[in-house]
Amino acid sequence: MTAIVCVSLLSEKAVLVKNLTDHVKAFYESIIGRFVSGPDTITEKRTMDSVIARKIVPSSTVILDGYGESFIRENPNATLMDIVTSSNNTAPKTTYQSIMPAMSALLGVPYVQGAFRHGIISKHGGKKTSLIILVVAPPSGFIRAASVGSSSSVVEVDSNATIKLDDTVGINSAMIKNTKLVSAAGLTAMGIEEIPIKCNSLDSLIIGWSMKYFKGYVDGYKSGVRDQATTILLNTPFKDLFVENGAGRMLPNDSFRVSESTIKNQVIEMGEGTKPDALISTHGDVFIDSEAVFTSDEQEKYRKDKDEEFFKKCVCNHIIAGDYGNNVIIIENPPHSDVRGLGVKYSFQVNKPELDGTESNGIKYYSKDTPQQIHDAILDVISDTNKSLLMNSKPIERTGKEAIAVCFKNGFPKKFAMVEMEKNGVKIVGMGDSPMLVLDNYPSMLSRAEKANRKSSRAKIDAPVVKIDTEDLDTNTLLDVIKKEVGSR
């Protein structure tokens, strides 16, 4: 069953309150429509026969509305953790690859890949810690055309939506007409039968990573390893996070603030000659210079007086205000009482007075020979600290042996973590990405159209195929099987 996947970002200041501009609202409503109530069954005439169609709600779609202001207003004592642990949060089976980017732009939030990266970076961060929520429910405007199978059964969902979700051409046109997005955020037209094929590897990537991280977030909370600021936010009732204004709108409660002692930011302390500007320019979505958020008055005063205490005070104030966001702060002399170091200081000095692993003020000191080696090592440390860190929607690539490209013939099993596979040198690729090995794993439930399309796609793969049942294998055993098969060829 087809689905649209939309990710909701929860932060201490917003619980999926969509900021749709006026010129987008009409388009948004034309897609989601409103569910039309009526009888549970519909009698439909087909030539000489009448078929009883049972109205059902699709179970494997992700709602576009999510939890908005009405939910907050109706559940003032609920918390973010109540949503996180909801049994409704299960992964959908398929994804509309072509619509996802447009929906993310329309709602003003990154879709799962971007949001996932954001969440990982902010997991150990401070005030603006964000959380991924996949809210599973049917979008009310979802329309599936009635069809008659061998059992003469018909499934149909009533809706007054003016745009069908399978009409990507219509959505594309409406997007261009009603939004300011260039080229409609990359929407492309495709037939319904093409979607499962084109989205197979994308599903595994996005849903697999998201749900693993999502479950890890909850597990971390239960085991007590969550940083204090995040724990507070997850368990604060909505009535404390939001207040209702005179116009009946739910707005962030500015008087609510996480205790300053719980707010931490990650920092990298770099020595002279390590070229932090190059690191910031290359990975601006991850790193930020400590002075980048200073006001003009603060910058002028610091450059004039060179007062280190004033500098530290400014850094702390901006951390508390959340001005650094979720970025890792590059700083020369961090105020250790108010920020948490990543555990590294890199410098290359002729005498190298600091031995690798030397610890001082909670920060370990290391030495490297060139700025590039320093930058590579820093990325390694961040990758180790945030196990699933994504940069530019791709995992950080480690230097060394080439990753083993593996294609799962019947889709990547959701029981495994794709991040863990890539961390151990196994890259999961799609049908047309020249895999080194194809695993004919336990077959999924496929329609006849899917089987036909998969058969034609597989014929193009020039790689050894190994039949394997992944049902009873753990990650380590599967990795051993893959490496053994590749090593023997």
Curated annotation (Swiss-Prot):
Similarity section: Belongs to the phytoreovirus protein P7 family.
Function: Probable component of the transcriptional machinery present in the inner capsid. Displays dsRNA binding activity and may play an important role in the sorting of viral RNA and virion assembly. Together with the RNA-directed RNA polymerase P1 and capping enzyme P5, forms an transcriptional complex positioned near the channels situated at each of the five-fold vertices of the core.
Name by which UniProt lists this protein: Protein P7
InterPro entries: Phytoreo_S7
GO MF: RNA binding
Keyword Transferase applies: no
Species whose genome carries this gene: Rice gall dwarf virus
Keywords: Capsid protein, Host cytoplasm, RNA-binding, Virion
